[in-house]
Design a protein with these regions (language model features):
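Conserved ATP-binding/catalytic motifs of P-loop helicase motor domains
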Residues: 1-220
Length: 220
């Protein structure tokens, strides 16, 4: 049961063989395969999603509840916020000759959004960091006083701080220090958001609802 809990901390859905393999690995051969197979099937809250029949997908009741919560919140809060009236032109201070039109389009969409939750996806090397830097300038010109950046690991935080995101901190630290949360109405940027667990993402969305945060999930 402990192994399954650990697996689903980082995975929303897993195939049966992946679960069984990890249980076997941590069991170190002390229990035969048939006994392990039967024990896993009896774990409370484990849900068989079916298909393919020979190696079905599994999740947990807790994960389903979290996913449903996140989906419901996103749907219920669409269009409830004001957009950011910013007169800053992204990359107007750039000294390079690079074509920033795609990045500017992304920034415009985010700034003009009336949803509390937004997503920014881009492959490695697509210019996400410079886009976020310009986005922050737009947000500040649009009246946003507090912008906070959150990342999954200490190394990612170090990189962000070196790129002038001085307030960057880890997701774990952010969620643990609830007495030191940013003030209401802050703008949160969740970098490499796909590396966070479903539990962390759900907690972040709950905090956003409680504190009127706007949240941008960034990843590839």
């Amino acid at each position: 049961r402990k192994v399954v809990e650990q697996l689903f901390e980082r995975n929303g859905v897993l195939r049966w063989d992946a679960i069984l393999a990890e249980v076997q690995n941590q069991n170190l051969g002390e229990t035969d395969l048939e006994t392990l197979h039967a024990a896993i099937e009896k774990i409370p809250g484990l849900v068989n999603l079916g298909k393919p029949a020979v190696n079905p997908y599994f999740t947990t009741e807790e994960n389903i509840e979290r996913e449903n919560y996140c989906i419901d919140i996103v749907n219920q809060t669409k269009g409830v916020c004001n957009d950011f009236a910013s007169d800053y032109i992204p990359f107007s201070e750039a000294e390079d000759t690079f074509d920033h039109s795609a990045q500017i389009e992304v920034i415009d969409q985010i700034v003009q959004s009336k949803d509390p939750f937004a997503v920014f996806r881009g492959v490695a090397g697509a210019g996400k960091t410079s886009t976020l830097q310009e986005l922050c300038k737009c947000l500040k010109k649009g009246g946003v006083i507090n912008i906070h950046v959150v990342a999954p690991t200490n190394s990612a935080v170090d990189v962000l701080r070196s790129e002038n995101f001085e307030s960057a901190q880890t997701m774990a630290m952010f969620l643990q220090n609830k007495d030191k949360l940013p003030p209401k109405g802050s703008y949160l940027i969740i970098d490499e958001s796909g590396l966070n667990s479903l539990r962390q993402g759900t907690e972040m969305m709950k905090l956003a609802m409680e504190n009127e945060y706007r949240v941008l999930f960034v990843g590839d």
